[in-house]
Amino acid sequence: MQRRIFGIETEFGVTCTFHGQRRLSPDEVARYLFRRVVSWGRSSNVFLRNGARLYLDVGSHPEYATAECDDLVQLVTHDKAGERILEDLLIDAERRLSDEGIGGDIFLFKNNTDSAGNSYGCHENYLVGRSGEFSRIADVLLPFLVTRQLICGAGKVLQTPRGAVYCLSQRAEHIWEGVSSATTRSRPIINTRDEPHADAERYRRLHVIVGDSNMSEVTTLLKVGAANLVLEMVEQGVQFRDFSLDNPIRAIREISHDLTGRRTVRLAGGREASALDIQREYYGRAVDHVARRGSDPMSERILDLWGRALDAVEHQDYSLIDREVDWAIKLRLLERYRNKHGLELSSPRIAQLDLAYHDIRRGRGLFDMLQRKDLVDRATEDGEIEAAKDTPPQSTRAKLRGDFIAAAQAAGRDFTVDWVHLKLNDQAQRTVLCKDPFRAVDERVERLISSL
């Protein structure tokens, strides 16, 4: 598999249930969550020793952006490390609340919608070459991303005027544009704002904001892995059938509501195609591409998962993927509970289970319960996730950032970092600019660290 820099940014939903008379707003709860961060970072926007960025986003949503990763399992591991870091903040915040006489349970949800209809995202980042034609990448990717929910949606019980329906995607109802430079106002599928966080003459960052937040490690692996294969093909000039959509926004919603994958959507040229038709085209090209360029274990794993997910939808046999793909895992859980208790899909108890699936608190969240019972498959291990809370990826620029932060903190020195800059806030204001995200060794950074 061709080397590429990946990153995932995840916004988390926050809520709190209180035991006594005292109540706090979501903003106040979020501030309690970040109090420990602010105490050492003097800000609610910090970079961590593992190279990641942690900050409080608009609307009291904690956001975790993984460090630069160049391997899919590494990316999944660092994405999960973000959950563990936020879980630690949650436990600390509950302790603070208790110490101040405010009894309460804080909940952090790795999902994309709250009960008030607000949406928050999971953004994927892919480094692409500046030389390629970005508009072609967007044109080819758009139909793939609109239909990708078949293989990696998080699943959601949606209450509609005609009753409750089970949907493939949480995010689909909240996307309003195909390609745009905005992220919050219009919520496009692909964000075109040109911020490469790298050498702008060589690289561009593809920012995909249509995806669901995934609890399943394997779903995250497939989500990013399949998109990476499509990108690889576009970069190497593979030709695709034209599946340009007449109305991508209508299509993404219609596809989300159809678990059969067979409902057709209108294409720009007047033809019609189903989500399965479109995904089969991309999948078939990917199989041929990997066979031509030479296979590798990760490409084989992605193609196996991708193919089985499409087979599961086509044959309506979700057992093919109900240990690996979030929407199928959740559907199995909800259906078993419904059948056991004789409940309608619209039951508040089902809505509660739907939400609890995304609770990141171990021992309380339903996905964690399934994982402990060995009812879901994994892509990484607990020991690797624990290590990734403090250790940056060793093969990318993240190592330089993480090593610098750790050394500066150990030396008690004041510093400032972002994705490309490492700066000592001393009289000399020494700064190192790290423009190559693939570079994990840099003599300038080593000299800066040795001077501490």
From Swiss-Prot:
Molecular function via GO: ATP binding; ligase activity, forming carbon-nitrogen bonds; magnesium ion binding; ubiquitin-like protein transferase activity
Annotated positions binding Mg(2+): E9, Y55, E63
Top-level EC class as recorded in UniProt: ligase
InterPro entries assigned to the protein according to its UniProt record, in alphabetical order: Pup_ligase, Pup_ligase/deamidase
Residues that bind ATP: R53, T66, W419
Listed pathway(s): Protein degradation; proteasomal Pup-dependent pathway; Protein modification; protein pupylation
EC number: 6.3.1.19
Gene Ontology biological process terms from the UniProt entry: modification-dependent protein catabolic process; proteasomal protein catabolic process; protein pupylation
Keywords: ATP-binding, Ligase, Magnesium, Metal-binding, Nucleotide-binding, Ubl conjugation pathway
Reaction(s) catalysed (UniProt annotation): ATP + [prokaryotic ubiquitin-like protein]-L-glutamate + [protein]-L-lysine = ADP + phosphate + N(6)-([prokaryotic ubiquitin-like protein]-gamma-L-glutamyl)-[protein]-L-lysine
Active site (catalytic residues): D57
NCBIfam families given in the database record: pupylate_PafA (TIGR03686)
Matching PANTHER family: PUP DEAMIDASE/DEPUPYLASE, PUP--PROTEIN LIGASE
UniProt function note: Catalyzes the covalent attachment of the prokaryotic ubiquitin-like protein modifier Pup to the proteasomal substrate proteins, thereby targeting them for proteasomal degradation. This tagging system is termed pupylation. The ligation reaction involves the side-chain carboxylate of the C-terminal glutamate of Pup and the side-chain amino group of a substrate lysine.
Membership in a protein family: Belongs to the Pup ligase/Pup deamidase family. Pup-conjugating enzyme subfamily.
Other facts: The reaction mechanism probably proceeds via the activation of Pup by phosphorylation of its C-terminal glutamate, which is then subject to nucleophilic attack by the substrate lysine, resulting in an isopeptide bond and the release of phosphate as a good leaving group.
Protein name listed in UniProt: Pup--protein ligase
Gene: pafA
